[in-house]
Structure formats: C-alpha cells, structure tokens
C-alpha cells in the first residue's frame, strides 16, 4: 500500500527532476513554492499552476512572485481563487513577469488582470504582448506643455481646471457622485476625444463596471457592429476577486495605455475607478506577506507602490496620457494616508462634498477644497483667474457667516453680508448642472457649457447684475441665458 505521504514525496521528486517547483504552503491567496537549487524564479516572475482539484475539475492559477524566502523557496500571490490547490502541486516558472495583450485588438473588449477577455466575445487576437511591470519614462522623455483640458462642466472648468496630459483625482466619500462624474467625463470627453481611452475598474462593484460599459455602447465609444472601430479598452478586477488581482489590474490598464502612447503615439485617456481599492488590495497582500503595518493599518510600502504606478501614467513627447482617477475617501477624511498619498501625485483635485450633495447640488464639487496647478493667471488668463478668485472669496465669506446665520438668522447680518450671502447662494446653485448620464433619472437633458459661457455667467452674478433674479432660476441650468429664461418662466407661473 502506498501512503499519501510517500505518494506526495514521489510526485515532488519527479517535479524537481523536471525543473518545476511545487507548492509547500497555502495561506489564502498566498502560496509558498519550493524550486530546485539554482532555479529560483525572480521577483515579479509569474508562476502557472495547473492540475485537478479533488472533484476532478481543471485548475489553472497564475501567481506572481513577491518574496524570496531562502532555502530555494519563494512566496507568491495568486491572481485568481486558490480553491482546490493542494500542497505538492507543480508550479511552472514562466521566466518573465505577467504579460498581457496590447494594441487595437483590445479596443471594445473587457479583459481581466491577466489580459484574458471576460465579455464572451472570443479570444483577443493580438500578437503583441507587454509585461505589466515596466519602468516609468525618463525625465528627458516627459512633456511639459501646459494647456487646459475643457470638460464642459462649469464648476470644474472654472475653479479647478484640468491639465491636458495631467493627472486628475476625483475625491469623495461613499455616495457623493464619483462614478457618475467619471461617466459624465467619459460622455463629454471620450466622445470628442481624438485618441483612445482605457477604463480600469480596480476593486469596485460589478455594477460600477457595467454602467460605464452600457453608457459607452450607447454613445458609440464602443461600436458593437464593428468592434475594431471602438475607442476604449476596459480592464476590470472587481471586489470579489483576490487581492492579487485587485492590486495588479491597474498595472494591466496602465500597460495597455502605454502601448497606445509609446507605439501608436496617440493621446490616451485612462479612467481609473477606484485608487483606494488598489491601496486596500496592497494592504491585504502586505499583511499576508508578513510585513509590519504602517499608519491606520496601511502597508509600509504605500508611498513606493503609489509612486511606481502613478509615474507610469504620464505624458511623453510621443503622446499624452490624461488620467482621471476616482479616489474613495474613507469616513470623508482627506488626511487619511491613502487619499493624502494620492493627492501628492495629481495636477488637479476635484473634491466632492457631502454637504452639497445633501442640498441636491450636482456635481457636488467643493469650490474651496478643489485645487489645480493650472489655476494661475499666466496659464488660464487674467479674466478666468479673477472670476475664479471672486467665486472662491464669495463662497469663503458665505461659509464663515453660516454659523452666525444658524444662531441669529439672516436679519442680524449687515446689508453687505446679506448681499454676499444672496450672491453666494446663486453661485452655489449656478454651479449645479444637468448631467447627460443622469437624463434617464432626472428627465432634464444634459448640458455641455463652454469655458467662455461659464466665465460670462459667473462674471454677471459676482457684481450683482442678476440680483433681481430668484435663486431657483440658477438651479440645474446650463449657461446664464438659460437662468434668465427660467427666471422669466417662474415669474409667469407666479402670476
């Protein structure tokens, strides 16, 4: 009779002869793999484990080497579920990092972290693959031109304008409108955008990947009749996937974007939702690898991981990458290490406010917390800069007066302060805007407002030219002419 132990020893000895490693320990998504002397895989090499589980079903798991433990053992993180794996199973070292298909054949398709299609439209017919771990461009290759990236969203274009070829972060807690704002930007920008887009779904709900996919199909960014004419590639790693997949799905999306920038020399527009999930996945992996946690339980390598991923998605002289990233803010605390580390890499931060969302002001962009490196008079022009500063000063004064108003009421304010409050409330309402992607819920058609129209509108409110119009006339309108027309309609209704 052959015991299980002797059978396992026999299997392992055969694998060693064939120069294939074997699993010695499994702790959830983390595996220890032993290899023959002198044949240890390098850090980031991918290992492939194939076999059958006890029920006889085929298993195919890809892992990435994270640590060299000594004694010819490595520790690897699985990119898919480890259900059914057993000690002693063979692990083949591919001799290189994980590589994914890149190029035009990825457009219109949804891939996972391994570059495998998950949209039931057959395999991706690509002969070109890139490794997901690549160096950031050298300083000499970087593009330093400064130009505004118009979005058609009033409050964004005026107060915290985006830089073409820059990095943009949408910061907000749960349920304040980050994903809707990303979908609105896809609608406003990706349609008119001459290059291609890459959408990276990092550890979010499946629904939040499905909604943009349907939106892209409706707006013909994804062409169902002729998939090769699509303008976007999608890479998803949802919440239910192991931390290894959630940690690396952003690298897969970056790799696809880099191909379009470096090889095709195109302008690329990557959307990443959500950066915090990437950090959380890294935190899970870090704990499983036995590293000492840092502040608030995050991984000690948070700054390094964030830097290496952010520095890759940058603009070079070959092509620009304008990345738009949603950043979930835990407990609405912007000083949390994850959003604080992310903001250091960004050219513009759009902060979404729960207070504004509660008032029904959408997009709920906070005019005082949102920042942009482009908000300089020598970049945006004196007129734009002065208007934006006027809006911020009025909003700041209104914020300072709110405690007094809450305790004593408006009547106790000076005439000048009452006037400031009235204008600030009109500015707040004029900052709202009907959304294209929310048309089905609101029933009001979306509006795209040019930067010149936006500046003109706020310039009329600030000095008091429109003091005679009621506040509600400014709510959910496009340009200032629509507000005037709405005021006239409200007056007729009142009579």
From Swiss-Prot:
Binding site for ATP: 172-179
Membrane topology: Peripheral membrane protein
GO annotations of cellular component type: chloroplast thylakoid membrane; mitochondrion; proton-transporting ATP synthase complex
UniProt EC number: 7.1.2.2
Enzyme class of the recorded protein, top EC level: translocase
SUPFAM superfamilies per the UniProt record, alphabetical: C-terminal domain of alpha and beta subunits of F1 ATP synthase (SSF47917), N-terminal domain of alpha and beta subunits of F1 ATP synthase (SSF50615), P-loop containing nucleoside triphosphate hydrolases (SSF52540)
Alphabetized UniProt keyword annotations: ATP synthesis, ATP-binding, CF(1), Chloroplast, Hydrogen ion transport, Ion transport, Membrane, Nucleotide-binding, Plastid, Thylakoid, Translocase, Transport
GO biological process per UniProt: proton motive force-driven mitochondrial ATP synthesis
The keyword Repeat is annotated on this UniProt entry: no
UniProt cross-references to InterPro entries, sorted A to Z: AAA+_ATPase, ATP-synt_VA_C, ATP_synth_F1_bsu, ATPase_a/bsu_AS, ATPase_alpha/beta_chains, ATPase_F1/V1/A1_a/bsu_N, ATPase_F1/V1/A1_a/bsu_N_sf, ATPase_F1/V1/A1_a/bsu_nucl-bd
Subcellular locations according to the entry: Plastid, Chloroplast thylakoid membrane
Function, as annotated: Produces ATP from ADP in the presence of a proton gradient across the membrane. The catalytic sites are hosted primarily by the beta subunits.
Family label: Belongs to the ATPase alpha/beta chains family.
Classification via PANTHER family: ATP SYNTHASE (PTHR15184), ATP SYNTHASE SUBUNIT BETA, MITOCHONDRIAL (PTHR15184:SF71)
Protein name from the UniProt record: ATP synthase subunit beta, chloroplastic
Source organism of the structure: Pteridium aquilinum (Bracken fern)
Upper classification of the organism: Eukaryota, Viridiplantae, Streptophyta, Embryophyta, Tracheophyta
């Amino acid at each position: 009779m052959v015991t299980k132990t002797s059978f396992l020893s026999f299997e392992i000895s055969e694998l060693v002869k064939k120069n294939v490693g074997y699993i010695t320990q499994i702790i959830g998504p983390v595996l220890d793999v032993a290899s023959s002397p002198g044949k240890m895989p390098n850090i980031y090499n991918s290992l492939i484990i194939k076999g059958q589980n006890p029920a006889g079903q085929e298993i195919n798991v890809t892992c990435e080497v994270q640590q060299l433990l000594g004694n010819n053992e490595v520790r690897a993180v699985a990119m898919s579920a480890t259900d059914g794996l057993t000690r002693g199973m063979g692990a083949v070292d591919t001799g290189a990092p994980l590589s994914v298909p890149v190029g035009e054949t990825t457009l219109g398709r949804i891939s996972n972290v391994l570059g495998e299609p998950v949209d039931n439209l057959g395999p991706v017919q690509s002969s070109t693959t890139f490794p997901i771990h690549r160096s950031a461009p050298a300083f000499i290759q970087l593009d330093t031109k400064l130009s505004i990236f118009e979005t058609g969203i009033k409050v964004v274009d005026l107060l915290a304008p985006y830089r073409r070829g820059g990095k943009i972060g949408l910061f907000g807690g749960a349920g304040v409108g980050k994903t809707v704002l990303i979908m609105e930007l896809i609608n406003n920008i990706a349609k008119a955008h001459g290059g291609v887009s890459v959408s990276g779904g990092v550890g979010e709900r499946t629904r939040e990947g499905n909604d943009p996919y349907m939106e892209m199909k409706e707006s013909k960014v994804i062409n169902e009749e002729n998939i090769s004419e699509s303008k976007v590639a999608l890479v998803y790693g949802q919440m239910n996937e192991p931390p290894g997949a959630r940690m690396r799905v952003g690298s897969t999306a970056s790799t696809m974007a880099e191909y379009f920038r470096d090889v095709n020399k195109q302008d690329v527009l990557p959307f990443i939702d959500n950066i915090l999930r990437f950090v959380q996945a890294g935190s899970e992996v870090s704990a499983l690898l036995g590293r000492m946690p840092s502040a608030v339980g995050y991984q000690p390598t948070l700054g390094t991981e964030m830097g290496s991923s952010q520095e890759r998605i940058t603009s070079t002289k070959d092509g620009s990458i304008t990345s738009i990233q949603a950043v979930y803010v835990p407990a609405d605390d912007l000083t949390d290490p994850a959003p604080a580390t992310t903001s250091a890499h960004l050219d513009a931060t759009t902060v979404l406010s729960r207070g504004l969302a509660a008032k029904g002001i959408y997009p709920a962009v906070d005019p005082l917390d949102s920042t942009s490196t482009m908000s300089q008079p020598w970049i945006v022009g004196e007129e734009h800069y002065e208007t934006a500063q006027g809006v911020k000063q009025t909003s700041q004064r209104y914020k300072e007066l709110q405690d007094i108003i809450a305790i004593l009421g408006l009547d106790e304010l000076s005439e000048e302060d009452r006037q400031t409050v009235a204008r600030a409330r009109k500015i707040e309402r004029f900052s709202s805007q009907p959304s294209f992607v929310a048309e089905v819920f609101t029933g009001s058609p979306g509006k795209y407002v040019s930067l010149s129209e936006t500046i003109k509108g706020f310039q009329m409110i600030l000095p008091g030219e429109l003091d005679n119009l009621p506040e509600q006339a400014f709510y959910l309108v496009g340009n200032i002419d629509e507000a005037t027309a709405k005021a006239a309609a409200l007056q007729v209704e009142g009579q």
